[in-house]
Structure formats: C-alpha cells, structure tokens
C-alpha cells in the first residue's frame, strides 16, 4: 500500500489550503455577481420562462 515517505511541511499545507480558499472565494464572487445580474433583470444571456398568462384553452 502506498504511503507518503515524509511529512508534508506546514508551509506546503498552508499553500494548498490558501489556493483552495482563493479558488472558492472567486467562484462565490462569480455566483453572487451572476445572481445579482439575473435578479436585476438586465441580463440578456439567460432564457427562462416569462410570467405570461396564456389562455389557449378557450
């Protein structure tokens, strides 16, 4: 079974965590920006159903 030869240094561990947190923060910022764009109604890049009442049954 494969095992690590030496203990990972604290600096390397912190560097990996910082990279993960930075990536997560950027994705969260993108998601928030996207949500604001959709809610403001100024977005043209999304296609979703409008709240139109259609009376096709008559």
UniProtKB/Swiss-Prot annotation:
GO terms for biological process: translation. The keyword Ribosomal protein applies. Gene3D superfamilies: Single helix bin. Residues 1-22, 39-58 are annotated as: Disordered. Transmembrane segments: none annotated. InterPro entries: Ribosomal_bL32, Ribosomal_bL32_plant/cyanobact, Ribosomal_zn-bd. It holds the Pfam family Ribosomal_L32p. Keywords: Ribonucleoprotein, Ribosomal protein. GO terms for molecular function: structural constituent of ribosome. GO terms for cellular component: large ribosomal subunit. Belongs to the bacterial ribosomal protein bL32 family. HAMAP family: Ribosomal_bL32 (MF_00340). This is Large ribosomal subunit protein bL32. The lineage of its organism: Bacteria, Bacillati, Cyanobacteriota, Cyanophyceae, Oscillatoriophycideae.
